[in-house]
Amino acid sequence: MADHNPDGDPTPRTLLRRVLDTADPRTPRRPRSARAGAQRALLETASSRRLSGQTKTIAKGRSRGARSIGRSAHVQARGHLEEQTPRTLLKNILLTAPESSILMPESVVKPVPAPQVVQPSRRESSRGSLELQLPELEPSTTLAPGLLAPGRRKQRLRLSMFQQGVDQGLPLSQEPQGNADASSLTSSLNLTFATPLQPQSVQRPGLARRPPARRAVDVGAFLRDLRDTSLAPPNIVLEDTQPFSQPTVGSPNVYHSLPCTPHTGAEDAEQAAGRRTQSSGPGLQNNSPGKPAQFLAGEAEEVDAFALGFLSTSSGVSGEDEVEPLHNGVEEAEKKMKEEGVSVSEMEATGAQGPSRAEEPEGHTQVTEAEGSQGTAEAEGPGASSGDEDASSRAASPELASSTPESLQARRHHQFPEPAPPPGAAVLSSEPAEPLLVRCPPRSRTTGPRPRQDPHKAGLSHYVKLFSFFAKMPMERKALEMVEKCLDKYFQHLCDDLEVFAAHAGRKTVKPEDLELLMRRQGLVTDQVSLHVLVERHLPLEYRQLLIPCAYSGNSVFPAQ
């Protein structure tokens, strides 16, 4: 058909022309149709040929009107067969193939648009369309083959989409999704792995920080709060150290919510006695700052007088009204004793350097007697005798000693040891305080060796339970003797057998292996049931410890080696 130069470049066109020159110009017969005709000739007989001739004549008479349609269909089928021959396929390839060399491809290949050829099926038409579209998606020859993997291709496409969104200054969610063209593909493959800087225009709501909520300053509210705090009394502002808000002037005070008890004459007497003790206490401190023992004695007398006056004033009140003043008076006495104890500790710190502790004990007792008589006279009032004062002071002193805290009394006795007063001294200093409740130490338990139970007795009870279990009925205590005899007889037979076995084998000592061999001959020990299994199953704990070494605490193994 065409001249072919053997020295020229082996292009697809030249190769196809050689194939066409050497191929048979006739359309080859299909082997399937040939096989079908041969089978049909073998199966035909005389009767079948006669019937087929009749059917053919009938079919010809009926199909005369449709011969034109059949002829056109036959022509189309014939053309259809001609299109499927290798010659027609190669002609179509020659029409669409470019004139280029296989060994030296050109840099840019632009396919020539071929005329549309009617394809016989959809599959072949799709193949032809793919052949036409493949040269458009050819990547550059400088790319590595490993970068064309499908998984990595998706990643590069994502990078290209991100780069395109950054270049356009649009958020990634608004970018249209679709297949990228060849230019975006090559640009994504040529990207470096450095992370690009994110511009201000790209909004990432997941990573953006929440703006701080700043409230505008309300000048009116600030001035109102300032006015409320300025109108509040200073003592409430200083005393209120709780973590909640300060009480304003218009708000109800916390202290008014507490129940207030009506004032009685007994409470007035308490307040008066408290004022007298407070006024007399600082005077004593100013007069004799270097005499702590004298100060303590006078203080005790004042508290005694206060308690005596309180009892005398509250004697005419009813039972319920009498309990509350007593409780309040005891609480006030405790508070005063604590405050005076703090002042005493300060006095000790200031006056410990001077030699004031070497005073005579007689002077101390005289001062305490004088001050005690003055305090009792003020609290009792005119018309009371000295004997009544002594009796009332003796009655009130135990209550006062019990009301004062024990830790404060111990600290005072430890700091200021009072000298021994003469027999005519004050009653409070001579009477001892109530003894404190001292807990007895727990008795130390003797940690001796625990008494071990006799394994023989424990074994007998175990065997009794075992016998009753296998007998499936309870057993009386009288049967225990018979069980014990059976056990003795069994162990006696076992020992005799061991002795005979040892004498026959020439052994001087019997080992566990010998016993296991004997019990294996008797049928008690088998491959499935070993000697240890029998011991664990049938012997009590005491015997098991003797036969099988058991580890105990203290790194000691029983039995000891």
Curated annotation (Swiss-Prot):
Q: Which sequence positions carry the modification called Phosphothreonine?
A: T85
GO biological-process terms attached to the record: cell division; chromosome organization; chromosome segregation; kinetochore assembly; mitotic cell cycle
Cellular compartments annotated: Nucleus; Chromosome, Centromere; Chromosome, Centromere, Kinetochore
Q: Which SUPFAM superfamilies match?
A: Histone-fold
Region: Flexible stalk domain; residue ranges are: 93-421
In terms of Pfam families, this protein maps to:
CENP-T_C, CENP-T_N
Which GO molecular function entries does the Swiss-Prot or TrEMBL record give?
Answer: DNA binding; protein heterodimerization activity
Q: Which residue ranges does the record annotate as region Disordered?
A: 1-78, 114-134, 256-293, 314-457
Post-translational modification, as annotated: Dynamically phosphorylated during the cell cycle. Phosphorylated during G2 phase, metaphase and anaphase, but not during telophase or G1 phase.
**Residues where Phosphoserine is found:** S47, S343, S345, S356, S373, S385, S386, S397
Q: Which domain of life is it from?
A: Eukaryota
Residue stretches of biased makeup (Polar residues): 45-57, 276-289, 365-376
Spell out the Low complexity composition-biased ranges. Answer: 439-450
* GO CC list: chromosome, centromeric region; kinetochore; nucleus
| Compositional bias per record (Basic and acidic residues), positions renumbered to this chain | 18-27, 329-341
Query: What is the role of the protein in this entry?
Result: Component of the CENPA-NAC (nucleosome-associated) complex, a complex that plays a central role in assembly of kinetochore proteins, mitotic progression and chromosome segregation. The CENPA-NAC complex recruits the CENPA-CAD (nucleosome distal) complex and may be involved in incorporation of newly synthesized CENPA into centromeres. Part of a nucleosome-associated complex that binds specifically to histone H3-containing nucleosomes at the centromere, as opposed to nucleosomes containing CENPA.
UniProt note: domains:
The largest part of the sequence forms an elongated and flexible stalk structure that is connected to a C-terminal globular domain with a histone-type fold.
Q: What is this protein called?
A: Centromere protein T
Organism listed in the record? Macaca fascicularis
Lineage, uppermost ranks: Eukaryota, Metazoa, Chordata, Craniata, Vertebrata
Identify the gene encoding this protein. CENPT
